């Protein structure tokens, strides 16, 4: 009867050995997961400003920001855009929009026509004479 009692003990030992292996694997996988998280956190951190004004090859490849900005010419800074006029200013300009377009621009167009007519008359006279 001693042999059957030894068999379960050996089966328990064989079960314990793989569990220790799996626990080691779990620890390794957790460490790898932590390393992966650290790498991702470093990847998503904003790039630090590099104030080196030089555009030589060495300085262009100095860091990732320099490469993007100087080497590739990519700049992610916000460009200055037109600001919309405030609503109060629009209310004042609406009184000017009540007038028709012809009355607003009519005077300026007639002045331009008057100044151009003598010049065009001289040019046509010269063109005919030659």
From Swiss-Prot:
Keyword Zinc attributed: no
Which keywords, in A-to-Z order, does the entry hold? Activator, AIDS, Host nucleus, Host-virus interaction, Phosphoprotein, RNA-binding, Transcription, Transcription regulation
Where do the segments described as Disordered lie? 1-28, 80-130
Q: How is it modified after translation?
A: The phosphorylation by CDK9 does not seem to be important for transactivation function.
Q: Where is this region: Cysteine-rich?
A: 50-66
Modified positions (Phosphoserine) in chain numbering: 94
Gene Ontology cellular component terms for the protein in this record: host cell nucleolus
Bias-annotated ranges (Basic residues): 80-91
* Written domain comment of the UniProt record: The Arg-rich RNA-binding region binds the TAR RNA. This region also mediates the nuclear localization.
Q: What is this protein called?
A: Protein Tat
């Amino acid at each position: 009867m001693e042999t059957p009692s030894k068999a379960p003990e050996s089966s328990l030992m064989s079960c314990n050995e793989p569990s220790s292996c799996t626990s080691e694997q779990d620890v390794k996988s957790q460490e790898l997961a932590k390393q992966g998280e650290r790498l991702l956190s470093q990847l998503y951190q904003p790039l630090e400003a590099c104030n080196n004004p030089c555009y030589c090859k060495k300085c262009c490849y100095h860091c990732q920001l320099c490469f993007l900005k100087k080497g590739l010419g990519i700049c992610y800074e916000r460009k200055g855009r037109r600001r919309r006029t405030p609503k109060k200013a629009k209310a004042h300009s609406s009184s000017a929009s009540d007038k028709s377009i012809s009355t607003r621009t009519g005077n300026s167009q007639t002045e331009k026509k008057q100044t151009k007519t003598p010049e065009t008359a001289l040019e046509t006279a010269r063109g005919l004479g030659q």
